[in-house]
Amino acid sequence: HLRNHFGSKPFKCNKCNYACVNKSMLNSHMKSHTNVYQYRCADCTYATKY
């Protein structure tokens, strides 16, 4: 929790300059670097990664 107050972002992406305060946020961000769309609408062509 204190990382939020001090601005510490120890979890860094190895593909871009993104950094965050916890590993789960980094894991979510890493999906942006893939071409995998996990969630697709059954009624139209809409799809999203997360």
From Swiss-Prot:
Keyword line: Developmental protein, DNA-binding, Gap protein, Metal-binding, Nucleus, Repeat, Zinc, Zinc-finger
PROSITE patterns, alphabetized: ZINC_FINGER_C2H2_1, ZINC_FINGER_C2H2_2
MF annotations from Gene Ontology: DNA binding; zinc ion binding
Compartments (UniProt record): Nucleus
Any one annotated GO CC term: nucleus
Record flagged with keyword Metal-binding: yes
Keyword Glycoprotein part of the UniProt annotation: no
SMART domains given in the database record: ZnF_C2H2
Source superkingdom: Eukaryota
Annotated GO biological process: regulation of gene expression; segmentation
Zinc finger (C2H2-type): 1-5, 11-33, 39-50
UniProt xrefs under InterPro entries: Znf-C2H2_CTCF (IPR056438), Znf_C2H2_sf (IPR036236), Znf_C2H2_type (IPR013087)
Pfam families: zf-C2H2_16
Function: Gap class segmentation protein that controls development of head structures.
Family: Belongs to the hunchback C2H2-type zinc-finger protein family.
UniProt-recorded name of the protein: Protein hunchback
Species, as recorded: Platynereis dumerilii
Organism placement in taxonomy: Eukaryota, Metazoa, Spiralia, Lophotrochozoa, Annelida
